[in-house]
Design a protein with these regions (language model features):
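Cleavable N-terminal export/targeting peptides
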Residues: 1-25
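Hydrophobic alpha-helical segments of small multi-pass membrane proteins
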Residues: 109-111, 128-134, 164-174, 190
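Gram-negative (and chloroplast) outer-membrane scaffold detector with strong preference
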Residues: 35-39, 66-146, 211-222
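Short glycine/proline- and aromatic-enriched beta-strand/turn motifs that initiate or cap beta-hairpins
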Residues: 20-68
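Residues that define the transmembrane beta-barrel architecture of outer-membrane proteins
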Residues: 25, 59-63, 103-109, 124, ...
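Short loop/turn motifs that connect adjacent beta-strands in outer-membrane beta-barrel proteins
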Residues: 21-26, 74, 118-125, 178-181
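Flexible, solvent-exposed loop segments that connect beta-strands
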Residues: 41-55, 85-106, 136-164, 194-207
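Predominantly the C-terminal beta-signal and adjacent terminal strand-loop region
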Residues: 86-90, 179-222
Length: 222
């Protein structure tokens, strides 16, 4: 009779462990860092401008996170989360030596469908993903250099804006379980997106961005 409570306790623990092994309905939250580096292919600034006037952009690293929901043992929905990225815009082409001509903040809003390989309770699970990213650009700022290049002056400086666009995102990554709850996750993603920059002078420039994204974080599942 004394063994009955122990047996009941073991049964409860075993059922809980089995439930945790079932990934359908599991939520996973993570936090870490993310780097986005555009692979810029710039068109030329429209007339009137110096021929072959182009732009480039640097990469940016920011705190990030994400939410994953398991639809079943393999399929999942994932929403990466990050604070806005700040990118410096520099001259390229015939104005490659001009330096900084502006800056912008960018917020990628992404929804991904993922397929996770391996068993539901495997310690390491690689995954692939695909989805859509809405690249939101805001708080664009220009410099005196851009004003000088485009024929403006201090009283009427040249301003710029970037068009927010939708693009395709492809992703590969992996999740390493540290225990039943905590895990480490890393991923690499490529987004295919273009934008058009417009100056207050009326000139425009088309730019292919196609950024590469790297992220690494620690997460908790429940």
């Amino acid at each position: 009779m004394k063994t009955t409570p122990l047996c009941l306790a073991l049964a409860v623990l075993l059922s809980a462990a089995a439930a945790q092994a079932q990934t359908a309905g599991t939520w996973m939250l993570r936090g870490g860092v993310m780097n986005i580096t555009p692979d810029v292919d710039s068109g030329n600034l429209s007339a009137s401008s110096l021929p072959n006037t182009q732009i480039d952009s640097n990469g940016s690293t920011r705190p990030s996170g994400g939410i994953t929901y398991m639809l079943d043992d393999h399929w999942a929905l994932d929403v990466p989360i990050a604070v806005p990225f700040k990118h410096t815009l520099t001259g390229a082409g015939s104005i490659a030596g001009a330096g900084k001509i502006g800056e912008t903040k960018a917020l990628p809003i992404t929804l991904l469908g993922q397929y996770r390989f391996g068993e539901a309770n495997a310690q390491f699970r690689p995954f692939v993903g695909a989805g859509l990213t809405y690249a939101k650009f805001f708080k664009e700022r220009s410099t005196a250099t851009l004003t000088a290049i485009t024929g403006g002056n201090a009283s009427t400086p040249t301003t710029l804006s970037l068009e927010s666009k939708l693009g395709l995102t492809l992703q590969v990554g992996g999740t390493l379980a540290l225990n039943e709850r905590w895990f480490v996750e890393g991923m690499v993603a490529k987004t295919f997106v273009k934008t058009t920059g417009t100056l207050s002078t009326g000139q425009t420039i088309k730019v292919t961005l196609d950024p590469l994204t790297l992220s690494l974080g620690v997460g908790y599942r429940f």
